[in-house]
Amino acid sequence: AYFDCRHSKRRTASAVFYEMDYESRLIALRDRINNRTYQTGKSVCFVVTRPRYREVFAASFEDRIVHHYIALRLTPLFEEIFSERTFNCRKGKGQLYGINTLKEDIRQCSNNYTEDCHIMKLDLKGFFMSIDKKLLSEMVDRFIVRYYKGEDIDDLRYLCRVVILHSPEKNCERHSPLSYWEKLDKNKSLFTNGEGKGVAIGNLFAQIFANFLLNTLDWFIENEGIKHHGRYVDDFY
């Protein structure tokens, strides 16, 4: 998990600092997990302005290690239940795969471009900010109990609860002008969204658990007999 985390962050100041004594720090992290005293650290919060204003949280380097630990164990299990029509954050899928799938769907529905066809584009409004963290935590925990066979199952269940139920807005540094938050709707920010609601955009686990949460929607669409459909995070057709 550490090396996966370091792979794309090695030149950052936080990664360099951690690497200076990474063995001791990883042992200390392991001990806190074993003792059930692990707590998420301070996040960095900022607002991106393009293509639209959006609040983003960046977890500390050590917390990212924990996220990778979770992803390494759950992603292979999630892959076994995901629809082939889910494109984001999956090996062999992604944006280009989704675009090509849509092109092929159009070709088939239009009888090789000889007939008109129609596309219904949808998205889940305020999806990440509307997630009930307690519900998500319970769903993930039930999934782990049912499908995960590793000896570290108790550690995995514990870390998932801590990560999902964490409220990063209560311990963060803002790196954007406060005026940027005034441009956000109240349901677009964890600071004003309401207790127990919302998952921070910007963290690895947010994308992974979003796919897990919406997997039910994907299979509902397929079970309704809709052959041509696809989803990328909370946008789908």
Residue ranges and their predicted role:
Residues F17-R36, F46, S60:
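N-terminal accessory alpha/beta regions
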Residues E23, I27, A59, D63-L72, ...:
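Non-catalytic, well-ordered alpha-helical scaffold segments
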Residues S8-V16, G41-I65, I81-K93, S167, ...:
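Short, conserved non-catalytic motifs in the polymerase core
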Residues A1-I27, H228:
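Non-catalytic, polymerase-adjacent accessory regions of viral genome-replication enzymes
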Residues I33, R50-R52, Y69, R73-F78, ...:
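Generic hydrophobic/packing signal
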